[in-house]
UniProtKB/Swiss-Prot annotation:
It catalyses: (2R)-O-phospho-3-sulfolactate + H2O = (2R)-3-sulfolactate + phosphate. Its EC number is 3.1.3.71. The gene is comB. This is 2-phosphosulfolactate phosphatase. SUPFAM superfamilies: ComB-like (SSF142823). Pfam families: 2-ph_phosp. GO terms for biological process: coenzyme M biosynthetic process.
Length: 226
């Protein structure tokens, strides 16, 4: 049976395996963090994140791209400077999307492009890529990242998914569009342009983060335990 792939915005609309895409920067931060931490706990609420911090957990968090006081940045480059058992993460968009997912979900970005596509093919014949967007608005960087993931999975696509694949035929244009996106411009203004360049890198890791029961672990770790 051919893979069936659909693309949606902010929340899953079907019952297939979800891949959450928040290119700038939650997806990349989570993927990088799992090199240094056993698991990531995503929380949507700042107060809940602060409670974790008071209990001694390391917390990464931002709103509107700005790092929250007392937390480390939602940055794939910054999390590489830390190591531990658990990282708590709260972000403007990606963590909120994960909390709305009712079943298991993968976390996808360009850094783990082929790895997450291969995992999706292995786990299900029905996949839904969910774009996080920015505060309820369409984000071109998520659309383009989704297109590359969907192209790598390769299957029967709904029209939205097909449009995203058609949009990523020229990789140099994709990269330019991501760099010129509202999100990238804001991050650049806050001093995080290195993060943007990092998030554009493709296939630099085989990490496949899996969100399950409120926590994110590597797929290989879940396999080992189950």
């Amino acid at each position: 049976m051919a893979m069936r792939i659909r693309l949606s915005f902010e929340r899953p609309e079907g019952s297939g395996l979800c891949i959450m895409v928040d290119l700038l920067r939650a997806s990349a931060t989570i993927t990088a963090a799992l090199d240094r931490f056993r698991e990531v706990i995503p929380v949507a609420d700042i107060e809940e994140a602060m409670e974790y911090s008071r209990k001694g957990y390391l917390v990464a968090g931002e709103r509107g791209g700005e790092t929250l006081p007392g937390f480390i940045a939602n940055s794939p480059l910054e999390v590489k400077n830390y190591r531990g058992d658990v990282l708590v993460l709260t972000t403007s968009n990606g963590t909120r999307i994960l909390e709305s997912v009712k079943s298991d979900a993968l976390v996808g970005c360009l850094n783990n492009l082929d790895a997450v596509a291969e995992a999706a093919r292995e786990l299900s014949d029905e996949v839904e890529v969910v774009m996080a967007g920015v505060n309820g608005r369409f984000a071109i960087e998520d659309f383009l990242c989704a297109g590359e993931i969907i192209a790598a999975i390769d299957g029967e696509m709904d029209e939205y998914a097909e449009a995203s694949v058609l949009a990523v035929q020229d990789r140099s244009l994709v990269d330019d569009a991501i760099r010129r996106s509202r999100s990238a411009e804001r991050l650049g203004g806050l001093g995080f342009m290195d993060d943007v360049e990092y998030c554009i890198k493709r296939n630099i890791t085989g990490n496949v983060p899996v969100y399950r029961d409120g926590r994110i672990e590597l797929m290989e770790e879940i396999r080992r335990l189950h």
